[in-house]
Amino acid sequence: PGGFSGGDEPDGSGKFIATTFRNPRIAEQVNNLLKNRDGLMLGICNGFQALIKLGLVPYGEIRELKANDPTLTFNTIGRHISHMAYTRVTSVKSPWFANVNAGDVFAVPVSHGEGRFMADVETVKELAKNGQIATQYVDLAGNPSSDIEFNLNGSVCAIEGITSPDGRVLGKMGHSERKGENLYKNVPFAKDQQIFESGVKYFK
């Protein structure tokens, strides 16, 4: 479920998904998928909101969260944004990025009201050290940016996507699934991150 599940109030529909996944039976099977069956999980936009509310990113398991844990909150402009964003693959630790290289830049559509990644300095340092910062918003030169023209929601350290410690759970705001022939005109950079092809490749 996405869009405006639960009315998108008082926060994004990730809360709706997270509530479902906290059902003990479902939580048990999700943890089993990740810990015992070498599974993958991907959350895009509302899915990322759910993963971070559950603790699946950045911790790799469903857990109770603390007040200072990373979160996604309202965009700095205070409203929904729908735009093309330039994002750089910062780490290829995740199997979801098996078909691209660190440093590759893509143009990816974003559409959300609550996509601003927030975390304290120590948490960001730890994520960077572990290679868990998967993707970042960048300018036309490929550099992470705090400029609202490029970092559209105002995310800390321009972070667009993060992973679990082992990389098998990926959460990101950009809609990597919105790709196809002749969808975008006069937009620089590649559009296809080959995330889904990489996911299939993982199980072959």
Regions found by a protein language model. Name each.
Residues 1-6, 46, 113, 174:
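Glycine-rich His-Gly loop
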